[in-house]
C-alpha cells in the first residue's frame, strides 16, 4: 500500500473523524418502528441514527433522508450544517446530531419530514451512553397536525335529536402550522410558505386558487407580476405571497385570504416602528359525518396479508406445518374490523406478516447446513471497531451461500457502489485470503464500465469472525498490489446465525422491481414528490398540467418519460442520471416556457429534428454523457434564445453541414470527448455570439477554418486531438481570444506572428506537443502569457519567451529521451536514452511554482541520489499506477499516423528502452511510446514520445505480393474502354473473414462504370430485415487511396461520401420515410480506388439508422467490400433471388413495415398502478376545505370485547418473542465484541496504520458522494 502524504492526512482528518459508537439496548419496553430501532452516541459526541441516510441498509431509509427539513430536540431546532451547536449532518454513517447541548436525562427528538412523515424518537442519555426507548412515526404533514395540540383545537360535534343520530357541521378556529413566518421587503411583506409550487398539496391548492385578499378590510388587487411596493396589491409567484404595505397600520393588522374551495385563512401581524412581525395564522375547521367516515382506519394492507395467508393454508397439504399460522389468522379474522387503534392495526399486520415469513423462510442454523443454496446476511465493521465499514454500504445486504455435497461452501456478494474504485475484495477462509472471481453484472455507465460486480469465493466456518480485505484505489490501493493481501485494507465481518433456504436474488434486484417499469416508475416518482393532488396514486392530465416551475427527476433510473408531455407549465426540468433511451417527438411540444433542460448521463442515441421545435424560450440544454451518434439538421433551429449547449461525452463522429442553425445567441458549446475527425466548413457559422468552445478529446487533425469567423470567442479548448498544424487559422480575427488550450496534440511549428495581434491572450497551452522552437515573433506584445511548452522538443528559448512562460517550467523536454528508430532488414528497431518514467517524475517533482526548476539531466540525477531510491519506487510512493504502450505507426492518406502493431507494459513496469517490430508492408513508419497514468480510477495518457520517420520502399515477402498484384493489374492492361461492366461483390467485417450484416443489404452484382478512363462502382442496396422490422442504409462513405488499417483491422484515412443515384420510394412514389429517418439511398456511386484494383478491397463506412436504434452506437460501421475480379463481365447476369432478402423492390406494401416498435407500443393503453388507499381526509388536513354536505346517518357500531382482547394478547405475545430474540442478539453481539477486544489487544502495532487508512476511506466516501451526485449511490 502506498504511503499517504501528511498534507492529505491533515486535510482529510479535518473533515472526517473515525469514531466508534457505543450502543446500549433498552431495558424498557420497545415501541417498534419500521425505520428507526436504535440510537447511538459516537466518541465525538454525536447522536447517530444509522438507519436513515444515503447508505442505509433499507431502501426506505435511503429515500426518507432526502426530505428531512430539520430536527427538534426538546423544542430546540437543529439545522443541517457542519458547524454550530444545534446542528446535524447526514453522511454515509447516517444522521449525526451534535449532542454538546444535550444533557443527561430523558429526551424527545423529532425528525421533521413533511413528505414521508415525522419520526419521534425517545431516548435517555447518561454520560457517554444512550439508551433507546422508542420511535414512533407521526405521519405526513397533512396528517400529523391533527395529532398536535398546537395545530388543531378540540372539535365539537353536535348531534340532532331523534332516533337517528345526524352529525352537523361544527366549526372552530385552529392554528396552521405551515404558515408561521413572514419576511419584510421594501414597501412589502412576503409569506414564503404560501407558495403556489409548494410540496404540500393543500398549501399549493389554496395558493393557486386565491380569489381575494383583504388587509384590515381593504380589498387588495392581484397585480399578477407588477411590483407591490407601497400598494394595495398582492402577487403570488415562485418565492411566495407578496403583499404591499399601504393598508397596514401601527399595532395589530388582520389579513384574510379567501380561496376557492377552502375556508378563509386569517393571518394576524403587528406593526411597530416600521417593522412588521408575524403573530398567527388561523382557519376555521369543520367536522362532518363524512369526515368521521374518512377517519376510519384503512385495513386494505392487512386484508391483502389475510388473503396471502389463506392461500398458503389452502395449498399446504401438511396442516401441522401451518397450524400456528391458521390459529393466528382465525383470531385476526374474528376481530380486525373492529380495530380502532392505528398502532394495534400496524402491530396486527406485522404479526401476520412475521408468521407468514416464518413459515416461508424455513430458517436454518449456520451450524446445521446441508447441500443447497441459502440467503445470508452479514455485518462489516472497521477492523477492531464497532463502527460500520464502508463495505457495509458498498455491498448488497444479502449474500448468496452455496453449500456443496462435500460440505464446502462458497459465498457470493454484490458490489453496488464505487465499483470503479474497487480493485479487489476477498474474505479470509482457513487462515488465507482466497482469490475471488469477479463477475460484472447489470448495466454499464457512459464509459462502458459495469456499475455492479459480483465477487464469489470459498468460505469456511460462518460462526466465527472473519477478516475481509479490500483493495480500493481511492484509499491508496494500486493494481500492482493485486493479490498482495498485506497491502489491502482489513475489516471485521460476521454473519447471521441463521440462513434462509433458497435464493430469490439480491436486495437491489428486489428494489428495482418495486420501482416499476416505464411510465409506471415515473408515475411513482411523481406521486412521491407530491404531484398527486387528489391522492389516488395516479397522475391525471390535469395534475400534470398543475406542475409548475422546477421539476427535479434526476437519478431516479427512469426509462420512459412520455407521461410528461402534459406537464406544459414546467420551466426547469432535471432528467440527468436516468436510463432514458429516447425522447418522444412531441414530449416537449407543450412546454412553451421551458428555459432549462438537463438530460445528462442517459442512454440517448438519437434526437428527432423536431424534438425542441416548440421550446423557443430554452436557455440551457445539457445532453452530455449519452450515446448520440449524430445531430439532425435543424435540431436546434427554433432555439433562438439558447445560451448554453453541452454535447460532450457522446459518440458523435460526423456533423451535417449546418447542425447549429438558429443558435445566434449561443455563448458556450461543449463538444469534448466525441469522435469528430473533421468539422464541416459552415457548421459553426451561425454561432456569432459564441465565447467558449470545447473540442477536446476528439480526432481532429485541424481546427475548423470557420472558427476564425467567431469574433466573440474568448476561450478555445482543443486539447487531446491529433492536430498537426494551426496555420490554417487567422487568429488575428479573434480579438477577444483569452485562452487557447492545444495541449497533447502533434503541433510541430508555430508560424511567425500567428498570435501577434491577440492582445487579450492570458493563457497559451502547448504542453505535450512536438514543437522544436518558439520564437518571440509568434506572440503579442504582453508582459505575461502563462505559456506552457513543457514536454516538446525545445532546446532553448530567448529571455523574452522565458518571461512569457511565467511560473511554468521549460523542462523537461522530450528530446532528452532521444527516442530513435532504424531499419534493420525486415524489422524496425528503436533505442531510447532516457526513461519515460524519469521524464514523468522530473515533471511531477518540479510542477509547483515554489519548486526549483531542474534544467539538466545532471540536476535531475542529483535529485534521485538525494531521494536514495529508484524511479519506480518513488512513483509508487506517489500512489501512481501506470502502464507504457509502445506502438509501431504507419502514415495514412490523411496525414495521420495509424497504429499497426503495439506492445503493452502493464502493472507499474520499468520502461523498455530498446526493442523491435516486424514489418509487413511498404510505407512511412515511426515508433510512438506513451505513459498512461491512473489515479483514483482516472486513467489518461500523460506524455508521449515519437521517433524519426522510417521510409520502407518494399516490405517483406515483396516478391510474392508482386505476383499477386501483377495478376490483378492485368485488368488495367486490358485497357478497358469506356462502358459498363459487372462483377460480383460481398461485404466483410474488418477481419476480412466474417460476413458483415450489410452483406444481406446489397445486390451482389455490382456495376463498374468506366467514363473517360476513370472507373466508378455503382452498388444497389436493399432493405435489411432485423427481427420483424425493416431498415435501410442511411449514408455511405468510402476511404480514398492511402488509407491504413489499424490494429483491429479498421481502415483509417480520409473519406468521401458516395454519390446518391436514386432513393427508395413508398407506394405513392414519394421518398421513403419511417421513424428512424428518411431519404434512404438505393443506388450509390463511388470512385474505384487504386488499391482496390490491387487487392480487391474497398473500405466503406456505412450508417444504418435502425441498427443504431436497436443497439446504441452500432449503426455506424466500417466494412470492406470484396470485389471478385475473376467474375468481371460485360453481361449483366440475372440476380439470384435470396431467401433472406426481405424485399424484392423498393416499394413497401404494408403500413406495418413503417411502424417501429415504439409506434406499435403507443397503440397499447399503458397499465396504471393500483389506486392507493383513500386515507384520512378533511379532519387531518392542514387547510380545511369547505363542507360539501352533511351526513344523514351515523354508522352503527358493535363491540366484541372478548375477540378484541384475544387479538391484543396475541400481539403482546408476539412482541415479547421479538424482544426476547433481540436480547439474545445483543448478548451475542457483546460476546463478539469481547472477542474483538481480545484481538485488539494483540493488534496495537497495526492500529495507527489502520486509522490512517480508515480516515482516508471515510473522507473519500464523503467526497465521492458529492462528485458522483447519485441519489441511489449505495443501493
From Swiss-Prot:
One GO molecular-function entry: metal ion binding
Recorded GO CC terms: plasma membrane
Positions with biased composition (Polar residues): 1138-1166
Membrane disposition: Single-pass membrane protein
Effect the entry attributes to changing residue 225 to A: Disrupts hemoglobin binding
Region feature Disordered, mapped onto this chain: 1137-1174, 1186-1205, 1210-1248
Residue ranges of the TM segments: 1250-1269
Region described as HID 1: spans on this chain: 61-123
Keyword Magnesium in annotation: no
Residues covered by region (HID 2): 203-269
Effect of residue 197 to A: Disrupts hemoglobin binding
Summary of activators and inhibitors of this protein: May modulate heme uptake according to heme availability. In the presence of high heme concentrations, NEAT 1 facilitates fast heme delivery to Shp, whereas NEAT 2 serves as a temporary storage for heme on the bacterial surface. When heme availability is limiting, heme from NEAT 2 is transferred back to NEAT 1 and from there to Shp.
LRR repeats: 544-567, 568-590, 592-614, 616-638, 639-662, 664-686, 687-710, 712-733, 734-757, 759-781, 783-804
Biotech uses: Given that Shr is pathogenically important and that the protein-protein interaction between HID 2 and host hemoglobin is the first step of iron-acquiring process by Shr, small molecules or antibodies that bind at the binding interface could act as candidate antimicrobial agents and inhibit this important nutritional pathway.
Location of this chain's protein in the cell: Cell membrane
Top-level taxon: Bacteria
The NEAT domain, residue ranges: 369-501, 976-1138
Signal peptide (from-to): 1-26
Induction per the UniProt record: Part of the highly conserved sia operon, which is involved in iron acquisition and induced by iron restriction. A single infection event is found to be sufficient to trigger a significant antibody response to Shr in convalescent mice, indicating that Shr is expressed in vivo in an adequate amount and an adequate duration to elicit a host response.
Summary of the knockout phenotype: Growth of the null mutant and to a lesser extent that of the mutant that is missing both of the NEAT domains is impaired when hemoglobin is the sole source of iron. Mutant from serotype M1T1 exhibits a growth defect in iron-restricted medium supplemented with ferric chloride. Inactivation of the gene results in a 40% reduction in the attachment to human epithelial cells in comparison to the parent strain in serotype M49.
Domain statement: Contains two structurally unique N-terminal hemoglobin-interacting domains (HID 1 and HID 2), which are joined via a structured linker domain to a C-terminal region that contains two heme-binding NEAr Transporter domains (NEAT 1 and NEAT 2), separated by a series of leucine-rich repeats (LRR). The N-terminal domain mediates binding to hemoglobin. It contains two hemoglobin-interacting domains, HID 1 and HID 2, which are autonomously folded and independently bind hemoglobin. The linker domain may position NEAT 1 near hemoglobin for heme capture.
Function as written in the Swiss-Prot or TrEMBL entry: Hemoprotein receptor that plays a central role in the acquisition of host heme, a source of iron during bacterial infection, and is therefore an important virulence factor. Captures host hemoproteins and their iron-containing heme molecules, and transfers the heme to the cell surface heme-binding protein Shp. Plays a pivotal role in iron acquisition and growth under iron-starvation conditions. Uses a cap and release mechanism in which Shr forms a dynamic complex with hemoglobin that enables the gated release of its most labile heme molecule. In addition to its role in heme acquisition, functions as an adhesin, contributing to host cell adhesion and hence virulence. Specifically binds to extracellular matrix (ECM) components, including fibronectin and laminin, and mediates bacterial attachment to host epithelial cells.
Name of the protein this chain belongs to: Streptococcal hemoprotein receptor
Organism expressing this protein natively: Streptococcus pyogenes serotype M1
Lineage of the organism: Bacteria, Bacillati, Bacillota, Bacilli, Lactobacillales
Gene name of this polypeptide: shr
